[in-house]
Amino acid sequence: MARLLLVCLGGALGSGARYLTSAWALRAFGPDFPRGTLLVNVSGSFLLAGIMTASLQSEAVPPDLRLFLAAGVMGGFTTYSSFNYETLALVEQGRLAAAAAYLLATVLGCLAAAFAATLLVRWLAG
């Protein structure tokens, strides 16, 4: 039960952070392209890969903290379902180039961010 609470609390924090990040991106850039979800998913991929690499390479991240951060905070923060919905919305609006750009930016951006975080954490760990 305690572990479930860790995930739920982390999820609440991650969801709040996702909302704030998306709201900021909407105000900063406007509604023409889903930059908020892109920012959330790329940064979330970086953070999750960093958390997992650090926790699997050393004892620095205890298992309960990893559960709170990875399954909880990052699970609440990143949003694959929004990515799919926004891509479909762009297609339905006839904005095929924007849909393709968003799809590629998300997939490649998230992979690149995860790779960069893994390399960074391994480098920092020596």
UniProtKB/Swiss-Prot annotation:
GO terms for molecular function: fluoride channel activity; metal ion binding. Signal peptide: none annotated. GO terms for biological process: cellular detoxification of fluoride. Keywords: Cell inner membrane, Cell membrane, Ion channel, Ion transport, Membrane, Metal-binding, Sodium, Transmembrane, Transmembrane helix, Transport. Na(+) binds at G75, T78. It is found in: Cell inner membrane. GO terms for cellular component: plasma membrane. It comes from the Bacteria. Na(+) is not transported, but it plays an essential structural role and its presence is essential for fluoride channel function. It is a multi-pass membrane protein. Pfam families: CRCB. Fluoride-specific ion channel. Important for reducing fluoride concentration in the cell, thus reducing its toxicity. This is Fluoride-specific ion channel FluC. It comes from Anaeromyxobacter dehalogenans (strain 2CP-1 / ATCC BAA-258). The gene is fluC.
